[in-house]
């Protein structure tokens, strides 16, 4: 059990992130989860205060994250997830130094694990088309949920948006005449991205024939400006949007474990395969660095290599 002192110090840092840093709710949730795990790690080692933490305690926390605890049902974290947890821990210790709670930043020298370079998985163009067509949305007899689902999936693929960006859209963020969408990215950064005609048509159909029906099911005085609504008239959650995608993949016969991020990967990969400049793809994806976008060029190079290996007489 986490001690009262550790709980107070942890909550003080979280309050600082909310009030002073105004970090996004999703980021705050991740920090809280990682820091609760860290405080439990310290408590299990008999440490009741951040002033008693040493560099080796932080290093051992990383080891514990990577190893997991099968006996307690705690899964091992990937190098990427463990590195993310270390960011939260480092922030906590920097805060403790700044607030005079401790004298030294014992987490500063701890290095994150090096993640392996994994190529992002993407769908083929035919698989994406099958996915989109599996939800309907083209008949006037389609209900509001079908219209919503088609519009959501079309928008995800057309814009390459993150699932949180899509469900966070308000009606005023979409201009179907100009065929643009204003996305709220990580760190509150906005970007205006173009939307393809099929996605605009799906959005128009949903906004005209579907959304108003769903909105009437919600409390009138608390009507949400969200574009994508759930069956009760409230904003669609990330989890529900994920389920929409999984159901569509199942109906399309795609068994490769489709996720919202896979649709985003497909967006980037298909653009690069079509000859798009990597800097343009970076802007569309909302990546802070082009290095993040370059991983998708490896996917297209890998596809070219496979074709070459099967066709060139001197490949083998």
From Swiss-Prot:
Residues 118-309 form the Tyr recombinase domain. The keyword Cytoplasm applies. Gene3D superfamilies: 1.10.150.130, Intergrase catalytic core. The active site is at 162, 186, 261, 264, 287, 296 (o-(3'-phospho-dna)-tyrosine intermediate). Keywords: Cell cycle, Cell division, Chromosome partition, Cytoplasm, DNA integration, DNA recombination, DNA-binding. Residues 4-97 form the Core-binding (CB) domain. GO terms for cellular component: cytoplasm. GO terms for biological process: cell division; chromosome segregation; DNA transposition. GO terms for molecular function: DNA binding; tyrosine-based site-specific recombinase activity. It is found in: Cytoplasm. PROSITE patterns: CB (PS51900), TYR_RECOMBINASE (PS51898). Pfam families: Phage_int_SAM_1, Phage_integrase. Forms a cyclic heterotetrameric complex composed of two molecules of XerC and two molecules of XerD. Belongs to the 'phage' integrase family. XerD subfamily. Site-specific tyrosine recombinase, which acts by catalyzing the cutting and rejoining of the recombining DNA molecules. The XerC-XerD complex is essential to convert dimers of the bacterial chromosome into monomers to permit their segregation at cell division. It also contributes to the segregational stability of plasmids. HAMAP family: Recomb_XerC_XerD, Recomb_XerD. This is Tyrosine recombinase XerD.
